Each structure stands twice: as structure tokens, then as C-alpha cells.
Swiss-Prot record:
Reaction catalysis annotation: an epoxide + H2O = an ethanediol
Organism: Oryza sativa subsp. japonica (Rice)
Record-linked SMART domains: Leuk-A4-hydro_C
Name of the protein this chain belongs to: Leucine aminopeptidase
GO biological-process terms attached to the record: leukotriene biosynthetic process; proteolysis
Subcellular location, record wording: Cytoplasm
Record lineage: Eukaryota, Viridiplantae, Streptophyta, Embryophyta, Tracheophyta
């Protein structure tokens, strides 16, 4: 039984799911989905078949062709803390499809259910976040990026709500008894006050890109194939529409660089502030944190990254999470190429500078376990969420930039387009990429130590710090801070959030409380509306013992659930002793129900690690 993926029960000798037809009844009162899944395999199969599940109650399994007959199944009693529970089906000879009925748990790791008081619309809300290995908590599946699926989805929701999904919207209509295939009884499915939203995803995607949301959602059109959705009414929608007004132009830039956009639409959903990521690249419907709406179009930076995934990550996908750099390193490179065209070379270089500082910071984070500074780490038994970091993004970017510098941009552009067209709608591993690289760039292995880049720990000696006038100027100003010199108002007059972020990232960590407060008194960084700036400043302030910022830290941790902010703030508090550590535990005890389950688990692990 060869494993396909260290994070899945999928058996490499067996066919995998090729299509899923899903019917979901969203029970907001119980924070539960009552569901059915008609799964079609990539080839006929007989005997045992393993699927991934986590905290699912599986009610029945039956054949889907001819008169239905029960299929024997068993669910492992003891759930693995990382993998969940294997669902074993004993299929009749030459089975190609079968039907499962099941229910999710209120604690499903992919789902967050928000009650009306927790939303801006005063209506209930639910959204999914399946990356890295959480689709198995929504429906039984081969939850590995090696197994790409198409899917149909029916979402049965209260009529006052709207639903969206990372798929083509087919219709909004009355429920029909024939819809649900046993997900629940007819009376519940067709009850008054319910509506069905129907979706189809015809291009194959890995299960982690399955996504939906339902709530008081409205929208604004941005262009012929772009639209922004949001919960929170006209004010939020208008702000989002202004922030992302240039998205259609960005799509065109992406096509000019990387080839045709294969997903038809590029829509955006601004989620409630508990969303645990900056953005999630779900095809056709990118999920975004509201913290990217800054009022200065800077949020387009996050959108550029998620757009770039349309080619690198969604079209070509890492085969396992050990190959995650293939998704994120390529996408970080592609994002910066888009930014370079749309916002200029200086802005792209600034982006690279922030990334360079982030990569160096990860070396410190993983100094006691350098395995996770490799581009291809060994991750058996490790939850990907626990070691999520900037390494695959920034070291992956550095590797690709190193190749570009070696062969020249025109040749690298040709290589990149060839790579995308060759492997689109496929999942590949690092070894496949390296073979493709060596075949298409003969002799590259003699010019770059490929093994050192992929298997080596730390930052390779031929990685390069970015060069630009603004980057050097900001680093120089940061170096002067130690001696007590603050940047003048003229020097920062044109700074956006990114400039401040880079400045704060480059400040020495062993600073005095008086220096921190002096900086804040002049520039009010602790009150910034840009969370990148605010959190970077608070992270600097916490170790100095500046208790005057405890209120701002608490507000951040209670108002926003993005892990990019939770990790450094909880870590900074928990690494201290006394009052700071107590504050971290108190805030978490009061705020944990606000967090998405993924973020909650990460915060718990930080507090547990530091006692």
C-alpha cells in the first residue's frame, strides 16, 4: 500500500476520486452540514478503498449504478491527530461510483460558523478554508493535492442568505426532493424559507481548493470577468470596489506574462475579520481578509499574489505539502512580476526586500529544527499548519530568481510559459520540476547547485538581497535607529504601509522602551489602520515591556483572526514572563471562539509551547 502523500490515507495502487456531486443542507442552528456525496472514481475498482475524513459522521454508503445496494464501510475508531480517520469502503466488483451520506461536526476544522451578533449584516455566516488538509472535515475525499477533482455543488440555505463558491454559479432556485440524494429528509430539504444555490466546477482542482461561503453577501462588478463580494453592506462593498478597481487590468497583465487565464472569472470575496489568511486562491472566487482594504489600493498586492496562483498553484499544483514551494515560490515570483508591470520596479523591489527580511526571520524561528528551512522538508507526522512559514514563498522565490539571473529574463520567461503549458491541470513533485528544468535548460545543474537549493538547510550563498534605492534608504534609516535617530517627516512623507513595514522589520530587536515610545509619539504607528504596520510595531514594542501598548495588542487579537498577526503577537507575549504571558492566556481565553479553527489551533500550540 504505497502512500501517495504523507498527509493522506490515499493508496497509490488504487484509483482516486475524479468527480464529486455534493448536496449540502446548511444547518446554522446546529453548526452542521447534512450532506450526500456521489463520488466517481478515475477507474473501476473492487475491494477496499480508503478515503480521508476528520470528525465526520458517516451514515451510509451505497452503489450508485443500478438498484442501490449497501456498501460495507468502517470508520477508524481512533483519529490520527494529523490525518484524521480513514474511511474504508469495500466496493463490489468494477465499481466506478458510489453514494455516501454524512454530517459534519460543529468543530469541523475547515468551517467557521458565525452567529448574527458576530457579523456586520446581523445574519448568520459560514465559510470554508480547506488548505492544507481540511477538506476531509467537510466531505470524505482523497484529500491530497495529487488527486484533482471536478465537482457539482448544491447549497441549501435560508432564503435571506446568498451563497458563493469557487465554481460557476448555475442557478438560485427552489429545492427539489430529487436534489439531496439522502442528505436529509425531503421535508427538511424542501422546507419553506429555504433556497438552493447550484454550482459547477468543470476544471479539475485539488480538494484544498474546494470552497464556499453563505451569509448576507452582496456584490459590485469591477469588470467584464471580475466582481467583488462582501458581507457588511454598501459601505464595505464600496470600499472594496475602490480598493480592487484595477483587478481586471491585473488579469490582463498576468495573461501577457504567463499565458491564457483558464478559469473564466476572477471574483473576490471579502470575508469577516476572523478569516485566518490574507487571501486564499480558490479558483474563480478568491477569499480575502478585510484587513487588505487599506484605502490606498495597497490591497492589490495580496490580490496580485492570489491572481498569480491562477497559473502557479491552481493550474499546476504541488503533489504533496512537501512540495509546497512549487505553489508558493512560483506564485511569489509571478506576483512580483505582475507588481513590477502594474506598480513599477521600485515597488516590486520593496516587496522583495520585505520578503528577504521575512526569510531571514524564518531562519531564526527554525534555528532548532532546520529541516523546515529546506525547500523540500520531510513532513510525515507533521501538521502543515504547524510549520507554515515564509520559507516556501521566499526561498522558493530566491531559487527561481537565481535561475532567471543565470539564464536571463527572456529565456526564463520562455521556460516559465513552457512549464505552465506542459503541466497545466496536473499535480507534480519537485523531482518532476527538476527533470523538466534540466531538460529545457541544458547544463543548469553545472551552473547552480540544485541539490543545495532543494535539500539544503538555511539560505544558499548565491541567494541575493534585492537592490533598489528605496530599499537601501529604508535599511539605512533603520540602522540609525539604534543610535536614537528617528526618520524625519520629510524622509517618510511619501511612505505607504509597505515602506513602514520594511523599516520596522529592519529595526534591531534589542531596543529601549523609550525609543519605541518616541517613534510612536511621532508617527502614531500603534494606531495605524494598516495592520501590517500596527502589528510590526507592536511586535517590536512587546519585548521592551511597554505596557502602554497592551490595550492595542488586545484589540488586535480580538478584532482580527488572520494568522499572520496572531502568530507574532501571541509568540511575543508568550516568550515574555509575568504579565505579558498572563495577558496572552487571558486574551486567548476570551477570543478563541472568534477565531477560525485553524487559527485557534495555531494559537493554542504557541501558548502550549511557551507554557
Amino acid at each position: 500500500m504505497p502512500p501517495v502523500d504523507p498527509h493522506s490515507y490515499t493508496d497509490g495502487d488504487h484509483p482516486v476520486t475524479a468527480k464529486a456531486a455534493l448536496a449540502f443542507y446548511l444547518d446554522f442552528a446546529a453548526s452542521t452540514i447534512h450532506a450526500s456525496a456521489l463520488l466517481t472514481l478515475s477507474a473501476p475498482h473492487s475491494g477496499d478503498l480508503l478515503l480521508d475524513t476528520r470528525a465526520l459522521a458517516v451514515h451510509s454508503a451505497s452503489t450508485a449504478s443500478g438498484p442501490p445496494s449497501p456498501i460495507p464501510f468502517s470508520l477508524a475508531d481512533a483519529a490520527d491527530p494529523v490525518l484524521g480517520s480513514a474511511l474504508t469502503l469495500t466496493l463490489p466488483p468494477d465499481t466506478t461510483s458510489f453514494l455516501l451520506t454524512f454530517s459534519t461536526s460543529p468543530s469541523a476544522s475547515a468551517l467557521q460558523w458565525l452567529s448574527p451578533p458576530q457579523t456586520a449584516s446581523s445574519l448568520p455566516f459560514v465559510f470554508s478554508q480547506c488548505q492544507s488538509i481540511h477538506a476531509r472535515s467537510v466531505f470524505p475525499c482523497h484529500d491530497t493535492p495529487a488527486a484533482r477533482i471536478t465537482f457539482d455543488l448544491l447549497l441549501n440555505v435560508p432564503t435571506q442568505l446568498s451563497a458563493v463558491a469557487a465554481a460557476r454559479h448555475v442557478s438560485r432556485r427552489d429545492p427539489l426532493p430529487s436534489d439531496h440524494r439522502g442528505a436529509c429528509d425531503d421535508a427538511l430539504w424542501c422546507a419553506p424559507g429555504r433556497i438552493v444555490e447550484e454550482f459547477q466546477m468543470e476544471q479539475s482542482v485539488p480538494p484544498y481548493l474546494f470552497a464556499f461561503a453563505a451569509g448576507g453577501i452582496g456584490f459590485r462588478d469591477l469588470g467584464p470577468r471580475t466582481r467583488v463580494y462582501a458581507e457588511g453592506g454598501d459601505k464595505v462593498l464600496d470600499e472594496a470596489a475602490r480598493e480592487f478597481a484595477g483587478v481586471e487590468e491585473m488579469v490582463k497583465v498576468g495573461e501577457s506574462l504567463f499565458g491564457p487565464y483558464e478559469w473564466e472569472r476572477f471574483d473576490l470575496l471579502v470575508l469577516p475579520p476572523s478569516f485566518p489568511y490574507g487571501g486564499m486562491e480558490n479558483p474563480r472566487m478568491v477569499f480575502l481578509t478585510p484587513t487588505v482594504i487599506k484605502g490606498d489600493a495597497a490591497g492589490a498586492q495580496v490580490v496580485a499574489h492570489e491572481l498569480a496562483h491562477s497559473w502557479t498553484g491552481n493550474l499546476i499544483t504541488n503533489k504533496t505539502n512537501e512540495d509546497f514551494w512549487l505553489n508558493e515560490g512560483f506564485t511569489t515570483y509571478a506576483e512580483r512580476r505582475i507588481v513590477e508591470v502594474v506598480q513599477g520596479e521600485e515597488r516590486a523591489a520593496l516587496n522583495m526586500g520585505i520578503g528577504w527580511r521575512g526569510l531571514n526571520r524564518m531562519m531564526e524561528r527554525f534555528k532548532d529544527n532546520m529541516e523546515y528551512t529546506k525547500l523540500k522538508p520531510k513532513m510525515a507526522g507533521i501538521d502543515p499548519d504547524d510549520v507554515y512559514s515564509e520559507v516556501p514563498y521566499e526561498k522558493g522565490f530566491q531559487f527561481l530568481w537565481r535561475i532567471e539571473r543565470q539564464i536571463g529574463r527572456p529565456a526564463f520567461d520562455e521556460f516559465l510559459k513552457n512549464y505552465i503549458s506542459t503541466f497545466k491541470f496536473k499535480s507534480i513533485d519537485t523531482e518532476t520540476f527538476l527533470e523538466f528544468l534540466k531538460t529545457n535548460v541544458p547544463g543548469i545543474e553545472n551552473q547552480i547547485d540544485l541539490q543545495l537549493w532543494i535539500e539544503g538547510t538555511g539560505i544558499p550563498p548565491d541567494a541575493m538581497e534585492p537592490e533598489s534605492a528605496i530599499y537601501k534608504k529604508i535599511c539605512s534609516l533603520a540602522a540609525e535607529f539604534k543610535s536614537g535617530k528617528l526618520p524625519s517627516e520629510d524622509e517618510v512623507a511619501d511612505w505607504s504601509g509597505q515602506e513602514w513595514e520594511l523599516y520596522l522589520e529592519n529595526l534591531p530587536t534589542d531596543v529601549e522602551a523609550s525609543q519605541v515610545t518616541a517613534l510612536d509619539e511621532r508617527y502614531k504607528l500603534s494606531e495605524s489602520c494598516d495592520y501590517e504596520v500596527k502589528v510590526a510595531f507592536l511586535q517590536l514594542a512587546i519585548p521592551t515591556g511597554c505596557r502602554c501598548y497592551f490595550n492595542e495588542v488586545e484589540k488586535c487579537l480580538k478584532q482580527v483572526g488572520r494568522m499572520k498577526y496572531l502568530r507574532p503577537l501571541y509568540s511575543s507575549l508568550a516568550r515574555c514572563s509575568g504579565e505579558e504571558k498572563m495577558l496572552a492566556h487571558r486574551i486567548f481565553s476570551e477570543a478563541h471562539e472568534f477565531y477560525h479553527p485553524i487559527a485557534r489551533s495555531v494559537a493554542e500550540s504557541i501558548l502550549s509551547k511557551h507554557g
